[in-house]
Amino acid sequence: GFDRLIIVAPGMTPQVLFNKCSGLFKTWKYTNKDLDEVIISDRTPAKGAYAIWLRDRIEADEEMKNISANQIKQQQIITCTLEERILYELKYFKETNQHLDVQKITLCAGSRNQSGVVPNVRWYGSKMFVGWYNPDDQDDLLRARAAVI
């Protein structure tokens, strides 16, 4: 079930959260720009805190494999944003000293950049990577995390 609560407080922007991760472990992102300047998410805490529920899993949802961000949007499936995924990483790391998505990749289909590409997060080697996929990309490793608002 959906038993992992993620609370997004005001001020928790993509770059703020990425910086918090960078203070705890190695990180990499696809751009030198501030993530706050390039990320557009379905939900933000700009108007106040909110909460979502995710499945409590290390790897992104098996149920979401081979489904592109565009298909997710067409089917109106609610999935985590980049902010929510990074918050989950921080929470999981503080609880376990381990990382999420060590074998798979979370497609953050609740977020886009200005040109419409979709962020993803994974643990690769010794770093948390924030990368990008085209909205039509789909494969077995790339999976969104379904969310309940």
List the predicted regions and their residue ranges.
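A binding-site-centric feature that preferentially detects glycan-recognition modules on secreted/surface proteins
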Residues: G1-I78, L82-I149
